[in-house]
From Swiss-Prot:
The name this protein goes by in its record: Phosphoribosyl-AMP cyclohydrolase
HAMAP family associated with the record: HisI
Organism annotation: Delftia acidovorans (strain DSM 14801 / SPH-1)
Underlying gene: hisI
Protein location: Cytoplasm
Organism placement in taxonomy: Bacteria, Pseudomonadati, Pseudomonadota, Betaproteobacteria, Burkholderiales
GO biological process, one term: L-histidine biosynthetic process
MF-aspect GO terms: magnesium ion binding; phosphoribosyl-AMP cyclohydrolase activity; zinc ion binding
Amino acid sequence: MQAMNWLDQVKWDAQGLVPVIAQEKDTGDVMMFAWMNREALAKTAELGRAVYFSRSRNKLWFKGEESGHVQTVHEVRIDCDNDVVLLKITQTGHEPGIACHTGRHSCFYSVLRDGQWQAVDPVLKDPESIYK
């Protein structure tokens, strides 16, 4: 069990989860925010691809299992408090890569302008054609 000690250093929340930020390795773009449980983080490190925990479905979610938009993980980092994980990834699927279920490059596609949220990044692929 010695090899898994690094997992014990993570400060899991009351539900056994840790917040995760996926950041594109080459551009620095923040792609998405999600959650991982212990099993998801262990599988991510083992497989070199992002595996998250879906709170709504209460199960592991292999990023790209439905869309084909896989995240290859190059590096797993943890913050100074050991309670947030950062994945340095390469996002695949319809260049420049689609991370968001809306068909956009990043889940952070809206900006606050004049007191309103405005979508500023384009839809790269219609989500209807992604999730069949």
